[in-house]
Amino acid sequence: MPLYHNDDQAMLKDSVAPFVAEQAPVSHLRKLRDTADATGFSRGLWAQFTEMGLPGMLVPEAHGGLGMGHMEAGIVLEEIGRNLTPSPFLSTSVGAVAALAKAGGTQAGRWLPAIASG
């Protein structure tokens, strides 16, 4: 696996990095912590992630996703981690998508489009 970015991956990084830095600084995490938010993440921020198509980046196009690969997900995770962004991206957009893709069938048909749409 190459450790460099192609043009599409560089564009992804160039759009996600400033977005996360501006919309989800560490102070955002502290605010969620201090208010003891039950979800542990900002629904508004997740809605913005959805507008960018991030929840569905690993979801196959046949299920309404972007059909990207794990390298692209890694780029997003790197930026989320850099800013300590409280987000369900790893558990939902990576973990759940991998499990559902493996399960296939009606479960994948039901849940993958839902994940892709946020």
Model segments located where?
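Flavin-dependent oxidoreductase catalytic core characteristic
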Residues: M1-P25
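Glycine-rich flavin
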Residues: A21-G118
